[in-house]
């Protein structure tokens, strides 16, 4: 039986998909599984209020099991939690090559300052994609216009380079607007069949590569933020 979160738990926080200076990025809460035994993980995520919070087991033989929560639902997979948790585990001195999430095994690598994960586009939630031709119009869309579903709004900024400007609204997950959405980046990459450089939210940056066999590699920068106590 799960019990309410009653205090004394330290939650680590990182920002995922920052720009090259460490700015912007999407905050991720990270709880060690051993610190929240018997606790209500969903209530923990709701109390923290981040777009996602993860509960991570201690790694064994280069693999760590992980569960992912938005403020309202548990997810089988998400991009920014896997990238962020992979970086955090390496920073703790326990790097992994695989994260086990409910959707399946997520391969992890790090190169050129980016943490990269490999995932299937079908692991992403069912996004509705809205392509815009006008960047100014994209910037004016009010998240309050969307009261259900998962909506990814995007426009090319440089089609030749694969550069995209994007926003994401997910009221179904309890997220009015997400700063950086890895799963949506993976899904869009799969739809377009090409690698992308995505700027989302206030200025977060996501990078993808597409494999002809259907796998997508998602990468980004991660920086530590201040931990919080519950």
Where are these regions (language model features)?
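Active-site proximal loop and beta-alpha junction motif in alpha/beta enzyme cores
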Residues: 1-230
